[in-house]
Amino acid sequence: MDKSKRPFIKSKRSFRRRLPPIKSGDRIDYRNISLISRFLSEQGKILSKRVNRFTLKQQRLITLAIKQARILSLLPFTKRKGFERSELTPRTNALKARNKNKQNKYQNNQTKFLSNF
């Protein structure tokens, strides 16, 4: 039988339904950081309802809880690795000299301006 003439047969393979992300005993609250932080992306953004597999009500509660936790500084607004504190580097002599030259130019301009009056 030709490939195009064969009838389409859907496989009868069973599938396992994924468990809901929130169990019945879990309380959606701004103090429950371990629960809330699961629904944030790598950048610290709130994941969508479709990604989280939430109902509309659950998504609204999670969003409000995350926003409250951010305002109370329990969660960061962003999770950027570039802004982590690094070791302080000592100032070089060239930088000090450059700043000193800028100050001298500023003072010279001030004195010239004031001497005109």
Curated annotation (Swiss-Prot):
SUPFAM superfamilies, alphabetized: Ribosomal protein S18 (SSF46911)
Keywords: Plastid, Ribonucleoprotein, Ribosomal protein, RNA-binding, rRNA-binding
Pfam families, per the entry: Ribosomal_S18 (PF01084)
GO molecular function: small ribosomal subunit rRNA binding; structural constituent of ribosome
GO BP, one annotated term: translation
Localization (cell): Plastid
Gene Ontology terms: cellular component: mitochondrial small ribosomal subunit; plastid
Region annotated Disordered, chain positions: 86-117
InterPro entries reported in the protein's UniProt record: Ribosomal_bS18, Ribosomal_bS18_CS, Ribosomal_bS18_sf
Main location, first listed in the record: plastid
Gene3D superfamilies hit by this protein: Ribosomal protein S18
Family: Belongs to the bacterial ribosomal protein bS18 family.
PANTHER family xrefs: 30S RIBOSOMAL PROTEIN S18, SMALL RIBOSOMAL SUBUNIT PROTEIN BS18M
Quaternary assembly: Part of the 30S ribosomal subunit.
Name under which the protein is recorded: Small ribosomal subunit protein bS18c
Gene that encodes it: rps18
